[in-house]
Amino acid sequence: MTAPRLISKYRIQIHRISENMVLNNDGLKEISTLLVSASDREPEVKLEKTKDNSSSDITTPPAEFIPSIFFSLHKIRKDPNNVSSQLETSTGFIRHRIKRCKALLQENEEVRNLLANSIEEWENIIADKEQQLRVKAKVLRDLDARIEKITN
């Protein structure tokens, strides 16, 4: 798969995930804005053509994290001798975002706790919370029925 297709594929997937995701934690929201596509927030910029002009212009918002990594790797694979100077500039903003995310994670204990659990652990935690909510809802329905019975 070519780099433009990878960029497009991951841009769409990340955008769909970010549209459906509601983050209640401010630290996670800030990290998400660093890593998730910024197509709604920033104008698109054109990335430069490769040396041999074999690829067409590719447009991508500057804050897209995953697609930028794939594009940089594609450039390295395509022309490993010419990318040493371009690598610094093309991945500089990626390193900057990683450093900012790391700083945010170090500052916020709650975010670290949220991200510390694995997917399986979160599935168990969510199942437990749903069970607790069902029990509480049943208690509330029983109380409502008792109140209704007493008032009638």
From Swiss-Prot:
Subunit structure comment from the entry: Component of the Mediator complex.
Cysteine pairings via disulfide bonds: none
Organism this protein belongs to: Candida glabrata (strain ATCC 2001 / BCRC 20586 / JCM 3761 / NBRC 0622 / NRRL Y-65 / CBS 138)
GO biological process terms held by the UniProt record: negative regulation of transcription by RNA polymerase II; positive regulation of transcription elongation by RNA polymerase II; positive regulation of transcription initiation by RNA polymerase II; RNA polymerase II preinitiation complex assembly
Superkingdom field: Eukaryota
Keyword rRNA processing among UniProt keywords: no
Family membership: Belongs to the Mediator complex subunit 9 family.
Broad class of where this protein is predominantly found: nucleus
A Pfam family matched in the record: Med9
Protein name stated in the entry: Mediator of RNA polymerase II transcription subunit 9
Coiled-coil residue spans: 98-150
Cross-referenced InterPro entries: Med9 (IPR011425)
One of the record's GO molecular function terms: structural molecule activity
Function summary: Component of the Mediator complex, a coactivator involved in the regulated transcription of nearly all RNA polymerase II-dependent genes. Mediator functions as a bridge to convey information from gene-specific regulatory proteins to the basal RNA polymerase II transcription machinery. Mediator is recruited to promoters by direct interactions with regulatory proteins and serves as a scaffold for the assembly of a functional preinitiation complex with RNA polymerase II and the general transcription factors.
Keyword terms, alphabetized: Activator, Coiled coil, Nucleus, Transcription, Transcription regulation
Any single GO CC term annotated in Swiss-Prot or TrEMBL for this entry: core mediator complex
Subcellular localization(s) per the UniProt record: Nucleus
